[in-house]
Amino acid sequence: MASSSFSFLLVAALLGLASWKAIASDPSPLQDFCVADLNSPVRVNGFVCKNPMNASADDFFKAAMLDKPRDTNNKVGSNVTLVNVLQLPGLNTLGISIARLDFAPLGLNPPHTHPRATEIFTVLEGTLYVGFVTSNPDNRLLSKVLNKGDVFVFPEGLIHFQFNPNPHKPAVAIAALSSQNPGVITIANAVFGSNPPISDDILMKAFQVDKKIIDLLQAQF
């Protein structure tokens, strides 16, 4: 009887683990492919499939020109070119997307998170200082200087950043993300540029600064 109970608990635990794993990332495909029907009025977790008989090679192709430099003339000096399911419908249900990241000298991809994806990141040109911060209560910063050909991984959901420390040369990187639609939350934009704005009282208490500083920060976004 004890042995049977243990076996039942073991099976239940394994099933629970398998179920957790199944919902921890994009759902696994149940067919060869599921090209997203971006025009369908049906709303599901992801996108409904177009008729597979109407699929063509173009559904799995995007002339994204990821070999071409992007404009980094902005406040932070960086540009992210993402190819996800919205640009490439064939990615639907496949659990992956790709991005090119361009950095001006001293350019920054500000602290942000991807709520639905782990990111693996490799430098193609230049040098980048990258890092992520662990969750509460430790909030440890794990960081590294990457050179051409180096690879770094950012765990799903954790705040991370990339910065070009070179004042004279640009940098380029490619990232792959473990979701067809990884999402991005840029921390400063979300906190100080939300719509409608977060109450000054909340931000003043959270950051332990006065209203003048909060107003200054909100004005940037």
Curated annotation (Swiss-Prot):
<keyword id="KW-0325">Glycoprotein</keyword>
<dbReference type="Pfam" id="PF00190">
    <property type="entry name" value="Cupin_1"/>
</dbReference>
<comment type="function">
    <text>Plays a role in broad-spectrum disease resistance. Probably has no oxalate oxidase activity even if the active site is conserved.</text>
</comment>
<dbReference type="GO" id="GO:0030145">
    <property type="term" value="F:manganese ion binding"/>
</dbReference>
<feature type="binding site">
    <location>
        <position position="119"/>
    </location>
    <ligand>
        <name>Mn(2+)</name>
    </ligand>
</feature>
<keyword id="KW-0479">Metal-binding</keyword>
<keyword id="KW-1015">Disulfide bond</keyword>
<dbReference type="GO" id="GO:0048046">
    <property type="term" value="C:apoplast"/>
</dbReference>
<dbReference type="InterPro" id="IPR001929">
    <property type="entry name" value="Germin"/>
</dbReference>
<feature type="binding site">
    <location>
        <position position="114"/>
    </location>
    <ligand>
        <name>Mn(2+)</name>
    </ligand>
</feature>
<feature type="binding site">
    <location>
        <position position="112"/>
    </location>
    <ligand>
        <name>Mn(2+)</name>
    </ligand>
</feature>
<comment type="similarity">
    <text>Belongs to the germin family.</text>
</comment>
<comment type="subunit">
    <text>Oligomer (believed to be a pentamer but probably hexamer).</text>
</comment>
<feature type="signal peptide">
    <location>
        <begin position="1"/>
        <end position="24"/>
    </location>
</feature>
<dbReference type="InterPro" id="IPR019780">
    <property type="entry name" value="Germin_Mn-BS"/>
</dbReference>
<feature type="glycosylation site" description="N-linked (GlcNAc...) asparagine">
    <location>
        <position position="54"/>
    </location>
</feature>
<keyword id="KW-0464">Manganese</keyword>
<keyword id="KW-0732">Signal</keyword>
<keyword id="KW-0964">Secreted</keyword>
<dbReference type="InterPro" id="IPR006045">
    <property type="entry name" value="Cupin_1"/>
</dbReference>
<feature type="disulfide bond">
    <location>
        <begin position="34"/>
        <end position="49"/>
    </location>
</feature>
<feature type="binding site">
    <location>
        <position position="160"/>
    </location>
    <ligand>
        <name>Mn(2+)</name>
    </ligand>
</feature>
<dbReference type="InterPro" id="IPR011051">
    <property type="entry name" value="RmlC_Cupin_sf"/>
</dbReference>
<feature type="domain" description="Cupin type-1">
    <location>
        <begin position="64"/>
        <end position="215"/>
    </location>
</feature>
<protein>
    <recommendedName>
        <fullName>Germin-like protein 8-2</fullName>
    </recommendedName>
</protein>
<dbReference type="InterPro" id="IPR014710">
    <property type="entry name" value="RmlC-like_jellyroll"/>
</dbReference>
<feature type="glycosylation site" description="N-linked (GlcNAc...) asparagine">
    <location>
        <position position="79"/>
    </location>
</feature>
<keyword id="KW-0052">Apoplast</keyword>
